[in-house]
Amino acid sequence: MDKTLLESTVHKVLDELRNRPIPLGVSNRHIHLCAADYARLFPEQAIREKKALLQPGQYAAEQTITLAGPKSQLKKVRLLGPLRNVSQVEISRTDARTLGIAAPLRMSGDLQGTPGIRLISPFAELELASGVIVAQRHIHMSPLDALIFRVAHGDTVSVAIEGSERRLIFDNVAIRVSPDMRLEMHIDTDEANAAGADDPHTFASLVARR
């Protein structure tokens, strides 16, 4: 194969990879707990896996928690595993209004200055001092994915939600790159409803880097 043909073939393959559908994950309200908070809420109980998630090693647990805010409660909020270093609650804007909490838009782990909430399990209650956020929409990528899409960790991009009757373009989609991540875009339930993402044929596609 001559050099020109080889380069043409490589560019064609890369273009196909860049234009391939990005799996779309809809994140319902959920909670991450540190070991100490988990032990208080579920004493002498091992965390039990209910369903594996697409991201390697992550799963929805059998355990659920009630979130108690100033205005209302949300019951049966799913715990995600494994346990983390810091407890964190991720909700939608609609959930925040229901609870009466001014949860800021943040990336996971960016918890400084965030409000707290009361956590209630079947065994105990715990006042979480901070950690309630509305998660910024984002795309998980491996380093190879990032190389193919020509983006880097911390970049923001515009993404089209395709495949439903309510095609929508989201700006300010954060890129998160790690060797243990698989390609997947995460949006919350408010964003999913706006884009008609309950359609099983829905997927994400990169529109532009911002």
UniProtKB/Swiss-Prot annotation:
Q: Which cofactor does it need?
A: Zn(2+)
EC annotation from Swiss-Prot or TrEMBL: 2.3.1.222
Q: Which residues bind CoA?
A: V26, S27, N28, K71, R78, N193
Keywords assigned by UniProt? Answer: Acyltransferase, Bacterial microcompartment, Metal-binding, Transferase, Zinc
Which residues does phosphate bind?
R84
Q: Where in the cell is it found?
A: Bacterial microcompartment
A Pfam family per the record: PTAC
Task: Please name the pathway.
Answer: Polyol metabolism; 1,2-propanediol degradation
Kindly state which reaction or reactions the protein catalyses: propanoyl-CoA + phosphate = propanoyl phosphate + CoA
Q: Name one GO molecular function term.
A: acyltransferase activity, transferring groups other than amino-acyl groups
Amino-acid positions noted as binding Zn(2+) 1 in the UniProt annotation, renumbered to this chain? H30, H32, E90
User: GO terms for CC?
Assistant: bacterial microcompartment
* InterPro entries to which the protein is assigned, alphabetical: PTAC
One GO BP annotation is: propanediol catabolic process
- Domain of life (superkingdom): Bacteria
User: Which amino acid positions bind Zn(2+) 2, per UniProt?
Assistant: H138, H140, H186
Question: How does the cofactor attach, per the note?
Answer: There are 2 Zn(2+) ions per monomer; Zn(2+) and CoA bind inbetween the 2 domains in each monomer.
Provide the domain comment. Formed by 2 beta-barrels, each is capped on both ends by short alpha-helices.
Chain's role: Involved in 1,2-propanediol (1,2-PD) utilization within the bacterial microcompartment (BMC) dedicated to 1,2-PD degradation by catalyzing the conversion of propanoyl-CoA to propanoyl-phosphate.
Q: Which family does it belong to?
A: Belongs to the PduL family.
The name this protein goes by in its record: Phosphate propanoyltransferase
Give the species: Salmonella arizonae (strain ATCC BAA-731 / CDC346-86 / RSK2980)
